[in-house]
Amino acid sequence: MTDRVDINRVLMEIRSFKAQNQAMNSVQGVGNSLEGVNNTRGTQQVNGPRFGELLEQAVSKVNEVQQASGAMSQAYIQGDSNVGITDVMIASQKAGVAFDAMVQVRNKLVEAYKDVMNMPI
């Protein structure tokens, strides 16, 4: 009976990975829509990375973590002896935390954008 519960738990985690991967693919479009962020007029040029570049790097990093987690779970499913369930679960949790943080950043950006758009001129 214990083996059956463990199999169900693994299947549930696989479904969770799939859902996270699908959600991550929908968030990847955010990076593409940020191209206009760097177009500024009438502002002073400063040295260092631009906001859009930083945000794009963050989205890319979250994507890398998600891809690594998916690859690790796929390797475990295929029976790779070098990948343990604990490694898969840790990678999954890291990917989940990174994705949740990215969603919160996106929510704050949308909220800030709405605040700026609602400001009287």
UniProtKB/Swiss-Prot annotation:
* This protein's record includes keyword Iron-sulfur: no
Q: Which Pfam families match?
A: FliE (PF02049)
Q: Where in the cell is it found?
A: Bacterial flagellum basal body
The UniProt keyword set, sorted, is: Bacterial flagellum
> Which terms in the Gene Ontology molecular function aspect does this entry carry?
cytoskeletal motor activity; structural molecule activity
Any one of the GO BP annotations = bacterial-type flagellum-dependent cell motility
Main localization is other
Q: Does the keyword Nucleotide-binding apply?
A: no
Q: GO CC terms for this protein?
A: bacterial-type flagellum basal body
Q: Which NCBIfam families match?
A: fliE (TIGR00205)
The entry's family comment says: Belongs to the FliE family.
How is this protein named in the record?
Answer: Flagellar hook-basal body complex protein FliE
